[in-house]
Curated annotation (Swiss-Prot):
Protein name: Putative protein NRT1/ PTR FAMILY 2.2
Keyword Cytoplasm: no
Protein encoded by which gene: NPF2.2
Protein topology in the membrane: Multi-pass membrane protein
GO biological process, one term: nitrate assimilation
Length: 516
């Protein structure tokens, strides 16, 4: 009898124990490859699509593209929260891939049916018919669908793939393949798909994106029985919000200097928690302060010391995150404007080949791969050998700021050269744009700031007309140089100092650790 019970228990455990592992690898990687080709295929050439197919003015098309890219880069955080807190990664990926497929099919229909877009006209013509409200409405619905679909798979697919493995070494190997596949799909979408859109037809280009998305969706769903399904564990953002709420509700309480007046959590958390909250950002120490009205069961009024310290750790890096946002704004502005520059340059390579304007962005991806490889294998080890100490993370950030400033300066010089060439009646080769484009890597949240910056410049100056041949884009780049210099000195070189995590939080910082 006992033997039959054991056998029954083993059979009930076997299905879950057999899930996960390397048998899920082909499904995850094939899904990622198809979704990457589809996603980069439509987003890389969006500015050109809006200008040529919807007769939208160049600057307005750039701003719309920035908003779309901003959503694609920010909404994955929302998708990750939904996956972690409520649904799990696998259902979110399935639904998102299907939504993305619907959006790309709608984009394909827009390019196939003439009444879903305005009549075509010559680029830059003042007689172009604007799209109707119905046509714009359908376009925005399609873009909303592909944005939600792309955002829903960006982080969750990586997390779901890593969760299939138990050993850290296997997870690391998966991430290596993950990024290799991601870049392969991005390069394929930014070259083959974009070339098809501009040289064959937009209908065929979006159709190929739809096929890639459909195949990836079918592959992912067919492997569902092999996946290890992660259970929702709750969002870490909830704990951060609870600290703010608890501290605010007890804002009038007097901060104590006694260890026993603070809540240290229950069970294992209470044993590993800090004895006293640190003195930095003391206002939030009230969240862990025990008062007469507090209850251990009410975690929106009483948090543990460890939760308070976790919140402070996140709060300390906010200025650095803001620095990343502001330093990324010049990069994404450059990314947007360089497509407009490419449209008015000579993109021919020989008599029969013309580089698509949207494909220029693939240089960012290729350059990022090369630079990361060179840094990890050559530059950083050589510096450590010569200086007898490694580069700190903030020093690497500072070096990145310098290169971004140089990139903006080069962009300004190249644009001034291009304008001079245009006034002389000649067209400039698109290869000139490669030099300044190599230094830029797109970071998503800055697309919104880039949109606001372009709007501000357009309203206050005459530097950004719809025909940039009559504008001063070089002055825009010089303005971005100034922004980059101010950002570097105010945040990277001035505000930040290192903390030694092995020492007490209250210990005075060593001035030698200042980042310069």
């Amino acid at each position: 009898m006992a033997r039959s019970v054991d056998t029954e228990a083993m059979t009930t455990r076997d299905p879950s124990s057999k899930r996960g592992g390397w048998k899920t690898f082909p499904f995850m990687i094939a899904t990622l490859l198809g979704l990457s080709i589809a996603s980069f295929g439509w987003v890389m050439n969006l500015v050109v699509f809006l200008i040529k197919e919807f007769n939208i003015k160049s600057i307005a098309a750039t701003q719309n593209s920035n908003i779309v890219n901003g959503c694609v880069s920010m909404l994955p955080v929302v998708a990750a929260i939904l996956a972690d807190s409520f649904f799990g990664n696998i259902p979110v990926i399935s639904v998102s891939a299907f939504i993305s497929l619907l959006g790309i099919i709608l984009l394909t229909m827009i390019t196939s049916l003439d009444h879903l877009r305005p009549p075509p006209c010559e680029t830059g013509s003042i007689l172009c018919e604007s799209p109707s409200k119905l046509q714009l409405g359908i376009l925005y619905i399609a873009l909303a669908l592909v944005i939600i679909g792309s955002a829903g798979t960006r982080f969750t697919l990586a997390s779901a793939g890593a969760n299939q493995y138990e050993k850290p070494k296997e997870q690391g190997s998966f991430f290596n393949w993950y990024f290799l596949t991601l870049y392969t799909g991005a390069i394929t979408g930014a070259t083959a798909i974009v070339y098809t859109q501009e040289n064959a037809s937009w209908k065929l280009g979006f159709g190929l994106c739809a096929v890639a998305n459909l195949i990836s969706f079918i592959v992912f769903v067919s492997g569902k029985r092999y996946y290890k399904h992660d259970k929702p564990m709750g969002s870490p953002f909830t704990n951060l919000i609870r600290v703010v709420v608890a501290a605010t509700r007890k804002r009038k309480a007097v901060i104590s200097s006694r260890e026993e007046d603070y809540h240290h959590g229950l069970g294992r958390e209470g044993k590993t928690s800090s004895a006293m909250p640190s003195k930095s950002f003391r206002f939030f120490n009230r969240a862990a302060l025990k008062t007469e009205d507090d209850s251990v069961n009410n975690n929106w009024r009483l948090c543990s010391v460890q939760e308070v310290e976790d919140f402070k750790a996140v709060f300390r890096v906010l200025p650095l995150l803001l620095a990343i946002i502001f330093v990324s704004t010049p990069m994404v502005t450059q990314t947007s404007l360089i497509i407009l520059q490419a449209l008015v340059t000579d993109r021919g390579l020989g008599p029969h080949f013309k580089i698509p304007a949207g494909s220029l962005q693939v240089i960012v991806i290729i350059t990022a791969c090369i630079v990361i490889l060179m840094n990890n294998c050559l530059v950083y080890p050589m510096y450590q050998k010569l200086a007898h100490k490694p580069l700190t993370p903030l020093q690497k950030v500072g070096i990145g700021h310098v290169f971004i400033i140089l990139s903006m300066a080069i962009s300004a010089i190249v644009e001034a050269k291009r304008l001079k060439t245009v006034t002389n009646g000649h067209s400039m080769s698109v290869l000139w744009l490669h030099r300044d484009f190599i230094a830029s890597v797109v970071i998503g949240i800055s697309f919104y700031l880039s949109t606001a910056l372009i709007t501000l410049i357009q309203k206050t100056t005459k530097w950004l007309p719809n025909d940039i041949n009559h504008g001063r884009v070089d002055n825009v780049y010089w303005l971005l140089v100034i922004v980059g210099v101010l950002n570097y000195f105010l945040v990277c070189a001035w505000f930040y100092r290192y903390r030694n995590l092995n020492d007490d939080d209250d210990q005075e910082q060593d001035p030698k650790d200042d980042t310069t």
